[in-house]
């Protein structure tokens, strides 16, 4: 299907050579055409919306389908824009531990002639570590080979102060639990999908204890305390969502 689209855009590009035209390589048009090359002033906006996010795009089946498309477009164009997704759109205030994949994905884009990159990772105040995600992605766009873990430490120390060590532990424990669970991380996920994995009862208790320590560490600094409490919202939201699904089973047990 992308062949017809690109041929149409090429006609426009020929008629208006001083203009640049951008088109989506999205869902049905994601894969590149076999017999047509986009003109230099035709920009390809390639979207990875269907990919799972628990590992880099190169490391799972849904991501590899996107990588195939990216490599195909890269072979015929130097004018590629990637629209990347990095938050949960159905449950935006919920944990989304994808920090460990950011660098490899950005390096992949750079390797394949991507000259523009939009990372849709923030939407509202109170999203899962949204400030840190924006900071890390911004830094990695400037330098894809920067030390990602060092960037996380730098941000946390500056933004959370003495609470930083506990929130770093929180991130790393949840990341490890996600990978160990084998459960995909999807942009239309529900916390309920992870209640036997990274959000199981034992880990939820661990997370709460870490946030309690984080709040205690900055209790005398109103600004830092509010930042920690705001970052706790995704955990609290998950607790409420999971509890909602289990309320009926508790009633059954009591009968």
Predicted regions span which residues?
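Catalytic-core regions of glycoside hydrolase
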Residues: 1-149, 205-208, 212, 216-221, ...
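Catalytic domains of carbohydrate-active enzymes that cleave complex glycans
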Residues: 140-255
